[in-house]
From Swiss-Prot:
This is phospholipase A2 inhibitor and Ly6/PLAUR domain-containing protein. It comes from the Eukaryota. It comes from Mus musculus. Keywords: Disulfide bond, Secreted, Signal. It is found in: Secreted. Residues 27-117 form the UPAR/Ly6 domain.
């Protein structure tokens, strides 16, 4: 605890010196990941190009296995979205998240409220598929959109889990906020880092006989 306090005091003093001298010193963020609605870790200096801190809490289901996780790290501000995002591929494969992005030292040391997980179908549908180890995804199934999901997404690229890198592609329903994600972005989740080569996001078509 004493060493942690000394380290934090040093970082604060270093940041103040950088500000006074106009040196443009790198950002420092809390870095951690873990199960539950919060996590705590060490303050780390962000690498070049990463100019934001993020804290993200997510609730996900993978083939029906549910989990709640929290992630804190450095990332590029242009890739960071503050707020709620929901995606659904199948009734048992989905993720909802709430995130906060900020640009001052240690600004992600707190927590964010857990996302509201409304699984009520809203009548919209999107092409759906999950294709690990693949670059494309046919979308021959249909995802039933829930809650505030009004858009269809098609994301593809590479995913990193620790030292493992592999291809992935997926399609399904999403909230409009998912459209913030663009091709070329690095998108974090609790235990994975996605490098997107494709990030399509379009309004979901209304079913026949149903107008806007």
């Amino acid at each position: 605890m004493i060493l942690f306090r000394r380290h934090r005091t040093f970082l604060l003093a270093f940041t103040l010196l950088c500000t006074l001298l106009g040196l443009g010193c790198p950002l420092t963020c809390e870095v951690c990941k873990g199960s539950g609605h919060t996590c705590s870790g060490k303050m780390k200096t962000c690498e070049d190009g990463k100019d934001a801190c993020v804290v993200l809490v997510s609730e996900s289901s993978t083939k029906g296995r549910k989990s709640v996780n929290t992630f804190k790290a450095c990332m590029k501000y242009k890739d960071c979205y503050s707020g709620f995002v929901s995606t659904t591929m199948t009734p048992s494969d989905y993720m909802v998240s709430n995130a906060h992005c900020c640009q001052s030292d240690g600004c992600n040391s707190g927590s964010v409220p857990p996302p509201l997980n409304n699984r009520t179908e809203n009548g919209l549908m999107c092409p759906s598929c999950i294709a690990p180890f693949q670059e494309t995804c046919p979308g021959t199934q249909a995802a039933r959109c829930v809650g505030r999901e009004t858009h269809c997404i098609y994301f593809a690229g590479n995913v990193q889990a620790g030292i493992i890198h592999t291809k992935f592609a997926t399609r399904g329903c999403a909230t409009e906020s998912a459209c913030h994600t663009k091709a070329g972005a690095e998108v974090p989740s609790a235990f994975y880092l996605y490098f997107l080569r494709r990030a399509d996001c379009l309004p979901a078509p209304y079913p026949p006989g149903r107008g806007e």
